């Protein structure tokens, strides 16, 4: 069963906007050797040059660190350092990291639009990190004056 991705939900009239969810409640639908699948999540799964969210899943009497989040055929796997003792969990995203990635992502789109308009170069790749971002353009025939 696919995982409901909370930050992709309809935004009209929602407060806060689902993109800004920092915490959520969910039920486990699957357990693997080092991961769980939830019925719903606000954790971003790695993809499109953007790193995975990290954070914690909490339940009465315990918590596990979310080390990585991966998406496979609509199912989102949360790789953990410990398995939950409950099927009901409360997820908490590392918001500082997520928000930095959101800002880099938006900046990448702005830069890509400007580079396309001014230089006719398309974005062919990008990678976001916690403290920086990289964007690849093609054709990348910039002169030293262009980059000054």
PLM features: residue spans?
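A glycine- and charged-residue-rich anion-binding loop/surface
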Residues: 1-148
């Amino acid at each position: 069963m696919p995982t409901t991705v909370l930050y992709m939900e309809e935004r009209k009239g929602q407060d806060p906007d689902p993109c800004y969810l920092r915490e959520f409640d969910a039920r486990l639908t699957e357990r693997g050797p080092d991961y769980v699948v939830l019925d719903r999540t606000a954790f971003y799964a790695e993809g499109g040059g953007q790193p995975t969210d990290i954070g914690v899943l909490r339940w009465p009497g315990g918590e596990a660190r979310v080390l990585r989040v991966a998406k496979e055929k609509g199912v989102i796997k949360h790789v953990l350092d410990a398995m939950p003792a409950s099927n009901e969990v409360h997820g908490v995203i590392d918001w500082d990291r997520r928000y930095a990635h959101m800002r880099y992502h938006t900046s990448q789109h702005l830069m890509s639009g400007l580079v396309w308009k001014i230089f006719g170069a398309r974005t062919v790749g990008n990678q976001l990190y916690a403290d920086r971002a990289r964007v690849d353009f093609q054709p990348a025939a910039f002169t030293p004056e262009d980059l000054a």
